[in-house]
Amino acid sequence: MKMINLDSKKLASFYVACELFKQIQQYPHTKLGLATGGTMTDVYHYLVNLLTKNKADVSQVETFNLDEYVGLKASHQQSYHTYMNKVLFEQYPHFAKNHIHIPDGYSENLEAEAERYNKLLDERGPIDIQILGIGENGHIGFNEPGTDFNSETHVVNLTESTIKANSRYFDNEADVPRQAVSMGLASILKAKRIILLAFGPKKKEAISKLLNEQVTEDVPATILHTHPNVEVYVDDDAAPDCL
C-alpha cells in the first residue's frame, strides 16, 4: 500500500484526476470503478477539465459505480445516478450511455438487482482503476463494519453513523435511506488498481486505523492490505501523525 500525502484536497484530487485521464488516454477501452460523495467532487471537476481540454475520446470507456441508495429513483436529487450526471456525464457528455453502470436502488427485487450487478461485473470486468472514499467508521463502498470479506454486490443496512454523516445532503436525517445496494468487499478487490482518497480531520482516525490495524472486518478498509496495488491519497488534515 502506497501513501501519498499532499497539501490540500484540491491538489490530491488533481493528481487522481490525472491518473484517471492517463488511463483513459492509454487504454481507450478502460473500465473505471467510480465513487460518489463530497470526497470525489473535485476529482470529477478536474477530470472533466482534462477531458474537455484534450477532446478525449471516451466512447469505449466503461464505468461501474460502487453503490446506490435503496428507495430512491434514478431521477431523485440525492440519488447517485443524479450525482454522477451532474459532476461527470452531463459535464462531458461523450460517454456511451450503455457503458455507464450504476446499481438500481429502486428495483422491486433488490436481491435480484444485486445478483444482476454482480454478474455484470464478472462478465465485463475486471475494473482497471477503482476509486474509493472511506467512511469515518472505516467503511468502503457501503460495506459497514462487520461486513464479510467475501461479500459481493449485496443489499446493506446503513449504520447510524453513516446515516448521520450523509444527512448533510438531505433536508433532514429522517430522509436519508436506511439501505443501499453496494459492491461487496470481494467485488472491490477484483480491480487491478485501487485508489482511495481521504480528506479532512474527520477522516484522520479512519486512515490511522487503516494503516495500523490488523486486517479485520471491524474496519472494512483494512482488507485493502491484501491487494497488491493500492494507493491512498490524503491531505494534511487527514494524514495520521506518523506520516
Curated annotation (Swiss-Prot):
| Taxonomic path | Bacteria, Bacillati, Bacillota, Bacilli, Bacillales
Active site positions: 67, 137, 139, 144
Q: Name one GO molecular function term.
A: identical protein binding
Give the SUPFAM superfamilies listed for this entry: NagB/RpiA/CoA transferase-like
- Indicate the transmembrane segments per the record: none
Which EC numbers characterise this protein's activity in its record? 3.5.99.6
This chain belongs to the protein called Glucosamine-6-phosphate deaminase
Q: Could you tell me the Gene Ontology terms of the biological process aspect for this record?
A: carbohydrate metabolic process; glucosamine catabolic process; N-acetylglucosamine catabolic process; N-acetylneuraminate catabolic process
Q: Which InterPro entries match?
A: Glc/Gal-6P_isomerase, Glucosamine6P_isomerase, Glucosamine6P_isomerase_CS, NagB/RpiA_transferase-like
* Task performed by this protein: Catalyzes the reversible isomerization-deamination of glucosamine 6-phosphate (GlcN6P) to form fructose 6-phosphate (Fru6P) and ammonium ion.
One of this protein's Pfam families, by short name?
Answer: Glucosamine_iso
- Origin species, per record, is Staphylococcus epidermidis (strain ATCC 35984 / DSM 28319 / BCRC 17069 / CCUG 31568 / BM 3577 / RP62A)
What reaction gets catalysed by this protein?
alpha-D-glucosamine 6-phosphate + H2O = beta-D-fructose 6-phosphate + NH4(+)
The answer to keyword Nucleus applying to this record is no
Q: Which PROSITE patterns match?
A: GLC_GALNAC_ISOMERASE (PS01161)
Q: Which domain of life is it from?
A: Bacteria
Q: In which pathway does it act?
A: Amino-sugar metabolism; N-acetylneuraminate degradation; D-fructose 6-phosphate from N-acetylneuraminate: step 5/5
Keywords assigned by UniProt, alphabetized: Carbohydrate metabolism, Hydrolase
Tell me which family the UniProt entry assigns to this protein: Belongs to the glucosamine/galactosamine-6-phosphate isomerase family. NagB subfamily.
Give an example GO cellular component term for this record.
cytoplasm
